[in-house]
Amino acid sequence: MIEPSLKALASKYNCEKSICRKCYARLPPRATNCRKRKCGHTNQLRPKKKLK
């Protein structure tokens, strides 16, 4: 079993992210635009889906 503090830390780096709908880039949770040029720095972001 994984420790709760480690689980929270891992979740911060792996789960609490935003995803670009056009190029699927993994972005910080508070991002407003994508950082990638190939999708034109679009603002179409979604939160990363949570584990069940």
UniProtKB/Swiss-Prot annotation:
UniProt key word Cytoplasm: yes
List of residues binding Zn(2+): 20, 23, 34, 39
Keyword set includes Acetylation: no
A Pfam family it matches: Ribosomal_L40e
Cofactors that this protein relies on: Zn(2+)
Subcellular location: Cytoplasm
Superkingdom of source: Eukaryota
GO biological processes: translation
Main subcellular location of this protein, as a coarse class: cytoplasm
One cellular component (GO) term of this entry: ribosome
GO molecular function: structural constituent of ribosome
Keywords: Cytoplasm, Ribonucleoprotein, Ribosomal protein, Zinc
Record function comment: Component of the ribosome, a large ribonucleoprotein complex responsible for the synthesis of proteins in the cell. The small ribosomal subunit (SSU) binds messenger RNAs (mRNAs) and translates the encoded message by selecting cognate aminoacyl-transfer RNA (tRNA) molecules. The large subunit (LSU) contains the ribosomal catalytic site termed the peptidyl transferase center (PTC), which catalyzes the formation of peptide bonds, thereby polymerizing the amino acids delivered by tRNAs into a polypeptide chain.
Entry similarity comment: Belongs to the eukaryotic ribosomal protein eL40 family.
Subunit structure, interactors included: Component of the large ribosomal subunit. Mature ribosomes consist of a small (40S) and a large (60S) subunit. The 40S subunit contains about 32 different proteins and 1 molecule of RNA (18S). The 60S subunit contains 45 different proteins and 3 molecules of RNA (25S, 5.8S and 5S).
Name of the protein in question: Large ribosomal subunit protein eL40
Species this protein is from: Candida albicans (strain SC5314 / ATCC MYA-2876) (Yeast)
Upper lineage: Eukaryota, Fungi, Dikarya, Ascomycota, Saccharomycotina
